[in-house]
């Protein structure tokens, strides 16, 4: 497995654990849920920024596709859908409502195929298509996000 794939798959696994921690915290009490959700929200946004600012533009450049008709454009739409769900959860928590499981399930539905596309198409393609120098530069940029 290449550098980009390894790094991003590990980040996906870490995010899945942060998501599980939020779900568990929500079962405890409101304060735990809010603190855990804040961490989740921050980490998801960091991850999406990394992809949208570093990896997706590189993928589009190297494949010769535009941001309107590439695999990355679909992934960006899914990011937007997840962020809308995250905003819904935040609003629910702010209103004192811990019943966010159905919104969490929607996020999980979106993310299953999303992660598969990234892990099985985008990241491996980048690992194969980029020169060793481009991979070093990309790795450095990923670690700064």
Model region roles, listed by residue range:
Residues 1-145:
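Small-residue-biased structural context
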């Amino acid at each position: 497995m290449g550098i980009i794939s390894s790094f991003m798959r590990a980040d996906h696994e870490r995010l899945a654990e942060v998501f599980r921690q939020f779900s568990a915290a929500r079962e405890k009490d409101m304060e735990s849920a809010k603190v855990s959700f804040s961490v989740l929200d921050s980490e998801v946004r960091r991850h999406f920024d990394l992809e949208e600012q570093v990896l997706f533009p590189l993928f589009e450049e190297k494949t010769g596709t535009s941001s309107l008709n590439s695999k990355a454009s679909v992934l960006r739409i899914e990011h937007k859908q997840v962020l809308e769900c995250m905003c819904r959860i935040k609003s629910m928590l702010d209103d004192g409502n811990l019943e966010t499981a159905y919104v969490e399930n929607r996020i999980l539905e979106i993310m299953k195929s999303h992660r598969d596309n990234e892990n099985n198409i985008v990241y491996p393609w980048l690992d194969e298509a980029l020169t060793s120098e481009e991979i070093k530069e990309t790795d450095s940029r990923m670690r700064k996000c």
